[in-house]
Amino acid sequence: MFKLVQLLGDNAVRALRDIAASGTFVDGKISNPHSRVKNNLQLHDAAAYERSSKILLDAMIQNADFMEFSFPARIAPPLLTRYTPGMHYGLHPDAAYIPLPDGQLRTDVSCTIFLSDPADYDGGALHVQLGNADLRFKEAPGVAIVYPSHTLHEVEPVTRGERLVAITFIQSLIPDVQQRNLMHELNEIAALEGGKMEPANYTRLQAVQYQLLRMWRR
């Protein structure tokens, strides 16, 4: 299960593009030196990283769709990455844990935030294998795709222009993907239909929601 989220407005997208334009990028293997499939660039500028990650983190925690889909306990500071012609990121799952200054983060949910206009580059689609479905995403600036970190995915080769995105990983309060999906579905039903229910039945539904969260939260 995945979700597309309108995460950023035009002003935030412009601010992130400006940060990227003046920031220093290095070989993406600096953070994954043993990868045989990673071929991109990533921001390597402490001040720019701090500014860009704050913009993105603020947007995430203020976005109800993002929060209600991922149930975040911790969010890794988002990182700007760039692809120019010839670059790609071959098929891979995300690592189970990533190191952070305050300790390892378990990667339950992955997120890519698109910052380039799709018309400004060719290729570069995010290809995600979800079950038997092969899905490709090349979204408008400011849109985020959120999906389970264990899924196989790749960035197809860029053949023209520049693909600028931000990526991050989420440790979820509900690490089991099936339980997380069920909780999200139940919450959506409650939000959509709760106002039409008899008060007593809505109270019972809330009790089920709360008890499942108690059972599944880690």
Curated annotation (Swiss-Prot):
The species this protein was found in: Sphingopyxis alaskensis (strain DSM 13593 / LMG 18877 / RB2256) (Sphingomonas alaskensis)
Cofactor needs: Fe(2+); L-ascorbate
Enzyme's top EC category: oxidoreductase
Protein name: PKHD-type hydroxylase Sala_1910
Coiled coil location: none
Keyword Thylakoid: no
Cofactor-binding details, from the entry: Binds 1 Fe(2+) ion per subunit.
Upper lineage: Bacteria, Pseudomonadati, Pseudomonadota, Alphaproteobacteria, Sphingomonadales
Residues involved in Fe cation binding: H92, D94, H153
Sequence positions that bind 2-oxoglutarate: R163
Gene Ontology biological process terms, A to Z: DNA damage response; intracellular iron ion homeostasis
Cited HAMAP family: Hydroxyl_YbiX
Source superkingdom: Bacteria
Domain (Fe2OG dioxygenase) ranges: 74-172
UniProt keyword annotations, A-Z: Dioxygenase, Iron, Metal-binding, Oxidoreductase, Vitamin C
Gene3D superfamilies linked: q2cbj1_9rhob like domain
EC number, as in UniProt: 1.14.11.-
MF annotations from Gene Ontology: 2-oxoglutarate-dependent dioxygenase activity; iron ion binding; L-ascorbic acid binding
Keyword Metal-binding assigned: yes
InterPro entries: Oxoglu/Fe-dep_dioxygenase_dom, PKHD_hydroxylase, Pro_4_hyd_alph, Pro_4_hyd_alph_FE2OG_OXY
